[in-house]
Swiss-Prot record:
The keyword 4Fe-4S does not apply. Keywords: Bacterial flagellum, Periplasm. Belongs to the bacterial flagellin family. The keyword Signal does not apply. The flagellum consists of an outer layer composed of repeating units of FlaA around a core that contains several antigenically related polypeptides. It is found in: Periplasmic flagellum; Periplasm. This is Flagellar filament 34 kDa core protein. GO terms for cellular component: periplasmic flagellum. Component of the core of the flagella.
């Protein structure tokens, strides 16, 4: 359970990073 939670947390963090990158490129 803990490992699964860590994996989903990492996945969410990565998804947020990609989204922020896309937004930053859109703004430029």
């Amino acid at each position: 359970m803990i490992i699964n939670h860590n994996m989903s947390a990492m996945f969410a963090q990565r998804t947020l990073g990609v989204t922020n990158n896309a937004i930053g490129k859109d703004m430029e």
